């Protein structure tokens, strides 16, 4: 597997509340994670850092999970535990009240990939030169779009597009979505925060992934492109290919 991770403050925000990286368990099986924190007074970066650290620490203590069913069970259980720990920590620190974070994570299983998500950080797959979104946003705007109350055009600039219906650290229990999809050697997996998807149209995202650039160059282009469109939020990108037994960079 080859993975490339990038995170950038963007052009507007004063600090970066995104987090993520590539982490391995005892049998060198990787998990890839992206989290986008929320909350005032830097509480968002506390929440996203906790989510990534707690989930990756739990993963580092496991041995290989070979089936999609095993991975789904593990992700649901551990993300629930991460949520519980963030809630407890926020309750113990007054200045962290109201903090939370999105989370999207993926683990490879033979010829498949298992993805889990909470919030509006997304997972995409480029397969057969076509980009498709694997995850569903847990947001007010997505719900309005799903029920036909607004159009896709309305959704792009909706004044309440940042309101989440699900996030880690908000309630004692959280519903976690999981998806199992084929993952071939010619495919590319993309995990990202909304700082990318709110800035760069999906047609351009697809073109970048289809280009002849290296995986590292593609990750850099995503950051550059989001900033060129305004960089209104923190931008995080994690790209994965399974055709190279090579590990990319972790979060710094």
Curated annotation (Swiss-Prot):
Binding-site residues for Mn(2+) 1, renumbered to this chain: 36-37
CDD domains found in the cross-reference section: PP2Cc
Gene3D superfamilies membership: PPM-type phosphatase domain
Comp. bias intervals (Basic and acidic residues): 1-18
Coiled-coil annotated spans: none
Annotated binding of Mn(2+) 2, by residue: 36, 194, 233
Catalytic activity annotation: O-phospho-L-seryl-[protein] + H2O = L-seryl-[protein] + phosphate; O-phospho-L-threonyl-[protein] + H2O = L-threonyl-[protein] + phosphate
One of the record's GO molecular function terms: protein serine/threonine phosphatase activity
PROSITE patterns per the UniProt record, alphabetical: PPM_2
Protein keywords: Cytoplasm, Hydrolase, Manganese, Membrane, Metal-binding, Protein phosphatase
Record-annotated PPM-type phosphatase domain positions: 2-242
Region (Disordered): 1-23
Membrane topology: Peripheral membrane protein
UniProt-listed Enzyme Commission number(s): 3.1.3.16
Locations listed in the record: Cytoplasm; Membrane
GO cellular component: cytoplasm; membrane
InterPro entries: PP2C, PPM-type-like_dom_sf, PPM-type_phosphatase-like_dom
Requisite cofactors: Mn(2+)
Record-linked Pfam families: PP2C_2 (PF13672)
EC top class named in words: hydrolase
Family designation: Belongs to the PP2C family.
Function: Protein phosphatase that dephosphorylates EF-Tu.
Protein name listed in UniProt: Serine/threonine phosphatase stp
Organism, as annotated: Listeria welshimeri serovar 6b (strain ATCC 35897 / DSM 20650 / CCUG 15529 / CIP 8149 / NCTC 11857 / SLCC 5334 / V8)
Lineage summary: Bacteria, Bacillati, Bacillota, Bacilli, Bacillales
Gene encoding the protein: stp
């Amino acid at each position: 597997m080859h993975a490339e991770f990038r995170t950038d403050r963007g052009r507007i925000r004063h600090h970066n509340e995104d987090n993520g990286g590539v982490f391995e368990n005892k049998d060198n099986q990787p998990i890839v994670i992206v989290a986008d924190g929320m909350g005032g007074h830097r509480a968002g970066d506390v929440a996203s850092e906790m989510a990534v650290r707690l989930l990756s620490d739990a993963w580092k203590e496991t041995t290989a999970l070979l089936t999609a069913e095993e991975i789904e069970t593990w992700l649901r259980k551990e993300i629930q535990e991460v949520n519980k720990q963030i809630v407890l920590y926020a309750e113990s620190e007054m200045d962290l009240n109201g903090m939370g974070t999105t989370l999207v994570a993926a683990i490879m299983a033979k010829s498949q990939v298992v993805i889990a998500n909470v919030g509006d950080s997304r997972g995409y797959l480029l397969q057969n030169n076509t980009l498709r979104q694997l995850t569903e946003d847990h947001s007010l705007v997505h719900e309005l779009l799903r029920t036909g109350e607004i159009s896709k055009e309305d959704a792009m600039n909706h004044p309440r597009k940042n309101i989440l219906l699900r996030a880690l650290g908000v309630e004692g229990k959280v519903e976690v979505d999981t998806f199992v999809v084929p993952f071939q050697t010619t495919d590319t997996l993309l995990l990202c925060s909304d700082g990318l998807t709110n800035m760069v149209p999906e047609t351009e995202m697809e073109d970048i992934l289809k280009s002849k650039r290296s995986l590292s160059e593609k990750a850099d282009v995503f950051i550059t492109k989001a900033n060129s469109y305004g960089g209104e939020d923190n931008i995080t990108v994690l790209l994965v290919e399974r055709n190279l037994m090579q590990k990319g960079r972790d979060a710094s």
